Amino acid sequence: QEIIRHVSDGLVMAEKNGLPQVLKDFIVTHHGTTCTGYFYNRYINDGGDPDDVADFYYDGVKPTSKEQVILMICDAVEAASRSLKDYSEASISSLVDRIIDGKAEDGQLSDSDISLRELNTMKEEIKLYLQQMYHSRVVYPKRKGRASK
């Protein structure tokens, strides 16, 4: 799948361009060993064999540093937030909680030393950021008549 291949393609590009190992490590850990949920669910809903799911998992490496965890979570939240229909505080909060809790429950964070306190801080900061990013703006009316100088 093209979506899964972007990790290995990114690594090839990084090597071709002589990027340092630390950046290559970020490339291979930003999805860890997660499942491509959207495509997996569509496959299952279309009658696919639940035992034939290897193609829906990234073959990367789980993050080992806090910084890699931050990238993994921010990448997932950013992508998922684009599909929101409702940008209310509750909707954003639910999305962020679901993604971070899901990564933890899936064991994606188990090789890092990130603490629960740090994860909770991340949750709050990401929620605040998304609320600010998606907040409604007042539509300013245009002036009728002559334009002012």
Label every model-predicted segment.
Residues 2-149:
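Terminal helices and disordered tails flanking the catalytic cores of nucleotide-processing hydrolases
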